[in-house]
Each structure stands twice: as structure tokens, then as C-alpha cells.
């Protein structure tokens, strides 16, 4: 991607970062339920993630402008980490930036064994993104019979209405198994190359003996 950088969020860029994140979440909700007067992702919720212990925030810069970003919660041993929030500027989705952000995050924390994140059930774009693009697996489904722990006293999450806010998915991605798959692929590739090399040498020997 042209001139893409994922850099630690600086204090001076935080207001724009939060504004664009709110717009992105608002557009996702609007696409499913129509216009909403409530702020789907209130600023207090963003601040709670930004100021949480072990929080790390990154802004995605493309051609000198913030086009997305993420907020992470990194565990003490960096083994089980949380993707708290991830967004791409409204109107620029489906161009590969979200995937670029995520792959860069994986590179920044190579010792991570598992990543965890959540998303509401109505966000079909997110479901596709996390499962099909990033390799997460759905491991839990929150609903009225199995409520989300972070739900407000009135049964809501953020500015979403009760129906939308009661249904969430929890995702996990196990990095160790993915690394094993990558290592196995490299071994197979190396073995195939060695077989080709050996076959070429045998053919040369056969030609020399003629």
C-alpha cells in the first residue's frame, strides 16, 4: 500500500483519531439500522480503552493523513493480547488498509500466542474481515441468555439500541498454530527445492556417462 505507516498515536493527533473512529463505527451501524441520533461509540468508551493499563494505540498514516488505527491491550508477558478497537476511515474501507494494519500489528508483537477481540453480530463486514481475512475464529456468542459482561445496567453497549447491543461475537486467533503452518510450508518448499536439485545432478551425471 502506498506510503502506509502504522505509528504510535501522538497526543496531538488523538482528537482526530477519535473523531474518525467514531465516524467509522457510526457508518457501520447506519448501514444496518439507518440513521441514529446516539453516538454508537461514545468518546468515554474510546478514552477507557486508550487509558487502560497496558494500552497501546497506533494511527495508520497513508500519504500524510490518518486513515485508520487500532487500540491494543498488551498483557504483561505479551502472550495473550487484546485488539480493543480497530477502524478504517469511513469511505475508504475494502481497499486493504484494515488488513495492512492487522498484519503490521502481528509483526510488532511476534511473541503473542493468542489475540482476542469482539465485534457486534450485525457488523457483517467485520465478521468477514476477522474470520476470512485475518484468520480469527469465533469462540463465543453473547446474547440475552449469555450476556456480554461489559453491558451497561440498562442492557446497552455504547450508543447501540438494546437489540443490537445484546448480540456480540468473541474471536480468538492462535498464532502458534499459524507459525507451525508457515514453518511446515517453508520445510516443504525447501524439500521440494532439494529434490529438484538432486534430480538435476543425477541427470547431469547420466548425461556425462553417455
Name what the model sees in each region.
Residues 1-15, 175-210:
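Conserved N-terminal entry element of GNAT/NAT acetyltransferase domains
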Residues 118-122, 132-162:
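Conserved catalytic-core motifs of GNAT/GCN5-like acyltransferases
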Amino acid at each position: 500500500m502506498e506510503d502506509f505507516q502504522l505509528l504510535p498515536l501522538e497526543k496531538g493527533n488523538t482528537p482526530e483519531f477519535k473523531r474518525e473512529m467514531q465516524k467509522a463505527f457510526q457508518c457501520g451501524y447506519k448501514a444496518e439500522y439507518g440513521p441514529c441520533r446516539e453516538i454508537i461509540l461514545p468518546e468515554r468508551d474510546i478514552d477507557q480503552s486508550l487509558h487502560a493499563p497496558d494500552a497501546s494505540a497506533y494511527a495508520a498514516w497513508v500519504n500524510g493523513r490518518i486513515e485508520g488505527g487500532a487500540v491494543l491491550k498488551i498483557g504483561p508477558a505479551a502472550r495473550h493480547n487484546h485488539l480493543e478497537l480497530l477502524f478504517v476511515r469511513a469511505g475508504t474501507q475494502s481497499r486493504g488498509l484494515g488488513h495492512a494494519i492487522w498484519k503490521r500489528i502481528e509483526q510488532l508483537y511476534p511473541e503473542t500466542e493468542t489475540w482476542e477481540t469482539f465485534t457486534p453480530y450485525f457488523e457483517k463486514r467485520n465478521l468477514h474481515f476477522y474470520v476470512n481475512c485475518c484468520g480469527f475464529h469465533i469462540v463465543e456468542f453473547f446474547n440475552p441468555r449469555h450476556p456480554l459482561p461489559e453491558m451497561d445496567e440498562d442492557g446497552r453497549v455504547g450508543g447501540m439500541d438494546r437489540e443490537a447491543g445484546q448480540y456480540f461475537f468473541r474471536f480468538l486467533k492462535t498464532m502458534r498454530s499459524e507459525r507451525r503452518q508457515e514453518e511446515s510450508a517453508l520445510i516443504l518448499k525447501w524439500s521440494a527445492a532439494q529434490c529438484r536439485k538432486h534430480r538435476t545432478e543425477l541427470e547431469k551425471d547420466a548425461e556425462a556417462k553417455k
